[in-house]
Structures are given as structure tokens and as C-alpha cells.
Amino acid sequence: MKIGIIGSGVVGPVLATAFLKEGHDVMLGSRSIDKKELVKWKNENETGSVGTFKDAAQFGEILILATGGSVTESAVRLAGVENFANKTVIDTTNPIAQTPPVNGVLKYFTNVNESLGEKIQQLIPEANVVKAFNSVGNALMYKPDFEGIKPTMFICGNNEEAKKTVTSILDSFGWETEDMGKIEAARAIEPLCMLWCIPGIAKGQWSHAFKLLKK
């Protein structure tokens, strides 16, 4: 598949490399194609391509939003709302506010009755937004190693076929997937990032993931 990734910070390049390893065609999009991190990624991944947000959005059959939450909506507009139509859009973002954590707890710019995932779906109504990859750090997004135990990735979205596609991707990346329903479930999934970050911010412990136990 052709994968267009919008965002070249700490998440985008990791996912771009992962998709290349899985045999996909990948374009990593950035606000600035001269960004040194983007040039470095291209030099290390010759089969991948780079471009602007708009280039990546036009290129991809599946699109990945991997920007900071506070700039995601502006990134979508730069990429061109029309370029998201009828595509599966994996939303990895979290609505993290630009203020320091309090006792290890991140602040969000959304309230409990809304989510960034919903805002994105409203901005690109013809796209099939699926929230995923937001509840774990970038180092564990691809082939996480927990001694044979698959961690759980919680997803949500309005389109069933899009969620099946994302579930297949997550399976190839080494994850167990739990579908939490429609996009409104992002109100519950996004705060998992807060919980995941507390051990890291407070104790420097970042090598963990969530697991849903069932019987």
C-alpha cells in the first residue's frame, strides 16, 4: 500500500521506517522538506520518499496523522482537506496542551466530553478516521518485545472497513487490537496517553504498554 505520513517529529519517522520494513511504499511529509531530521531519515531509508504535508496526503492511500496535537488541525489544512476524502486516516495524536505537566500528569486542551479524534473527523468528514498508536511511546510502536506477550492497542472510528485495515496493520506490527467503537470513544482512549506518560515523567520509566485481560 501507499502510506502518506503527515508529521516528521518523533512519531512520523518511526512509523515510516516500520511501514517500509513491512513492504509498503512510504512518503514522509513535513512542513519543511529541508528539515535536518527529514534529510537524515531519507539518507537512512533510500526506498522511502519525502515531501510536504500536501505531497504526502496526495500520495497515500492510507494516511497517518503524526503531528503534535496542538498543530494537527493546521497540518490537515496545509495538507488539503480534499486529499483525505475516502481514505483511511490513522490518527496517532493526543491533545496535549503547551503547558508543563503537574506532578507527572499531562494537561489536555480538550474536555472530558470531546476529543481531538472527533475534531479531526469533523474537519475531514469524508475521511475514515481511526484513532490508534496514541497510547504508547514511539520506541514501542513497532514489534514491541514483552517476552512473547502482545500488548493491546485500543482503536476507535466510525468506519468498520477502515478499522479492519488498521487492525491488520497493527497485527503485522506485533499488536493485539481492541475496537472500542465509534470515534466518540477517543474521549476515553486519548487519556491513556496521560496514564502511559506518568511513570516516564515521574520516574524515567518508558518501557511499558497496556494489556486488556479478558475471561
Where do the PLM segments sit?
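Short, well-ordered alpha-helix to beta-strand connector turns
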Residues: G23, F59-E61, A127
